[in-house]
A protein has these predicted regions:
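Beta->alpha turn/N-cap motifs
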Residues: 1-13, 95, 111-118, 138-139
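Extracytoplasmic/secreted proteins, especially bacterial periplasmic and envelope-associated proteins
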Residues: 22, 54, 68-75, 97, ...
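Ligand-binding "clamshell"
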Residues: 9-26, 119-139, 145-160
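Short, glycine-/small- and polar/acidic-enriched structural segments
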Residues: 1-56, 64, 133-134
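An extracytoplasmic/periplasmic, membrane-proximal ligand-sensing/linker region
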Residues: 97, 114-134, 144-151, 175, ...
Length: 224
């Protein structure tokens, strides 16, 4: 199971992947990996993703070092032209420690790409409320991000998705993709796929993120 950008990088041999993995095959899109770029509201006057340009030396978490969150976060910020390399004081933490750090005032924001709702975001919002902002995306920034790899699409948080969230939030998500190798027997791939989709209701009882899974969009946003 790969994040969509890693599927694209694996096929082309770009980003953190050293050479093309042309033996890889996409089986289908699973649930969405939803971008939660979070920033203290005092630094987010517009509430939009480009407010990240207001960071000037403060600590910000893109994820754990060498994690998928860090790699996709760097790609997104590079593509948007946000100068995080010189303006952010990057910290590297997992989701749990990141939540504690923002609650304690040790960081000003965090990048949490995950299936929504995310428990770490829920905890942070429960304590900080309107002092915290999940940044919105615009059509312009979405188009810019999708220029090379058209993987991302809109993902909406209606009010109440997170504690103390009173306004609609429009962010983006890319699919987590189930992949296999070209040499795996077709029947084995079929049986695995069949088991997943025939037991979707059970998966949805285990984790709310799987409620995004639908057959009609299972081939959208595949990177390979």
């Amino acid at each position: 199971l790969l994040q969509g950008p890693f599927g694209a990088w694996s096929w082309t041999g770009e980003g953190p992947v050293s050479k093309p993995q042309t033996h890889m095959r996409s089986v289908g899109a699973m649930w969405q990996n939803v971008e939660h770029f979070v920033l203290l509201s005092r630094l987010a006057p517009t509430g939009e993703i480009m407010d990240l340009n207001n960071i000037d030396g403060e600590r910000y978490v893109l994820g754990q070092r060498n994690s998928g969150a860090e790699q996709t976060g760097r790609f997104i910020l590079d593509t948007l032209g946000i100068d995080y390399q010189s303006k952010f004081n990057l910290a590297y933490m997992g989701y749990g420690p990141t939540t504690s750090a923002i609650q304690d005032g040790n960081i000003v924001g965090m990048n949490v790409p995950a299936g929504a709702p995310v428990s770490s975001i829920t905890q942070a919002y429960a304590l900080l409320g309107d002092r915290l902002t999940i940044l919105n995306w615009t059509q312009e920034t979405l188009d810019l991000l999708n220029a090379k790899y058209p993987l991302w699409d809109w993902y909406d948080f209606p009010p109440g998705t997170y504690p103390n969230q009173t306004k609609h939030i429009r962010t983006i998500g890319s699919p987590n993709v189930l992949v296999t190798r070209a040499d795996i027997p077709e029947d084995a791939v079929y049986q695995i796929t069949k088991v997943i989709w025939e037991n979707l209701a059970t998966l949805q009882e285990i984790h709310g993120a799987t409620k995004d899974m639908r057959l009609d969009i299972a081939i959208e946003g595949l990177g390979a």
